[in-house]
Amino acid sequence: MGRYAKEPDNPAKSCKARGSNLRVHFKNTRETALAIKRMPLRRAQKFLKNVCEKKECVPFRRFNGGVGRCAQAKHWNTSVGRWPKKSAEFLLQLLKNAEANADYRGLDVDRLVVDHIQVNRAPCLRRRTYRAHGRINPYMSSPCHIELSLTEKEDVVSKAAENEPAKKKLSKKKLQRQKEKMMRNE
């Protein structure tokens, strides 16, 4: 078992999954992974299924040279997006694995959130393609390692409201006017 880049803050309330040397493009997978970061597990799974069906797009923020525009990217406040189906399928498999790990550990699956997800480059695999005049060019692939951890979201407890209403903050100008008024009244 390898070391993860980031250990969860509360190991009892989280679960992990990883995949090594996956034959899927690093750049597409990196953009897809960043899109599902901090999403609830159910929403992330639904999003990736929608990407496979081209109902939602993945915004391309870093590796977007030559990437076309799509209207679905407006949701992410950008104009550049794609539907990397293979990356989405690989991430769905990892999420399914992490969900099974969470179920085994007795965590509440409906409250899980994608806390950490990281995509690293794996060693390139080399093939060859034949060119004109007897030349040979490389035909490389860019596999990747993916690791993710899901954490059970804690309930947010709101502070009890005090009896006194909070004082409204006044600007310097209004404070000055109030002081002048008080000086006149005295």
Curated annotation (Swiss-Prot):
Cysteine disulfide links: none
Record region (Disordered): 159-186
Protein species of origin: Aedes albopictus
UniProt KW Ribosomal protein keyword: yes
Protein name as annotated: Large ribosomal subunit protein uL22
Annotated InterPro entries: Ribosomal_uL22, Ribosomal_uL22_CS, Ribosomal_uL22_euk/arc, Ribosomal_uL22_sf
GO molecular function, one term: structural constituent of ribosome
One Pfam family from the record: Ribosomal_L22
BP-aspect Gene Ontology terms: cytoplasmic translation
Ranges of compositional bias, category Basic and acidic residues: 177-186
Keyword Ribosomal protein found: yes
Keyword terms, alphabetized: Ribonucleoprotein, Ribosomal protein
Family label: Belongs to the universal ribosomal protein uL22 family.
A cellular-component GO term for this protein: cytosolic large ribosomal subunit
